[in-house]
Amino acid sequence: MGAGSAGCILANRLSACGKHSVLVLEAGGRDWHPILYIPAGFMKTLVNPNFNWMYESSPSEGTNGRIIPAPRGKVLGGSSSINGMGFNRGQKMDFDVWAQMGNSGWSYDDILPYFKRFESYVSKEDQSYRGATGEVTISDLNWNDTLCEAFMDGAESLGIKKNPDYNGADQEGISYLQRTVKAVSYTHLRAHETVDY
């Protein structure tokens, strides 16, 4: 299996009992480059074939004939190494639709325990939807930006509510990005699968 988000987590889970070994093969290189550990560095990875498979969509009517970049990580840690350190579980409704289409075990309620198991969410928000002891540290920004606040106030004036935890009970609304960052002394360190698993 590859050493992306799913591969590293699955290898960790399969080998956790100590009876099994798992070989993880990654087509990309090591995750040593400094731009992988700088939040804004992800912008350079989006155009760098050393870190990104450079996939693109096909032109379609829905995109008015445009080709849309679809970045995928080509490095240890996979796309978790090139995602700007952002974290988003996805919409509850998407998982529920998969279950309704016959993929039993894939509803949001079915997978919520697994989300909670791998994360350690550092926040004062409601913890009933969040994990606290997992390997991947998820944190909120510890600062506010005047421009971002004005943007969110504008969205709120249009009826889009502020949501302090879009990975919690409700995914709708506007929020600061949650990030996969660990506090390390006076600096911060990317938390991604090759580090955490």
Language-model features: where?
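N-terminal redox-cofactor-binding region of secreted/periplasmic oxidoreductases
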Residues: M1-E193
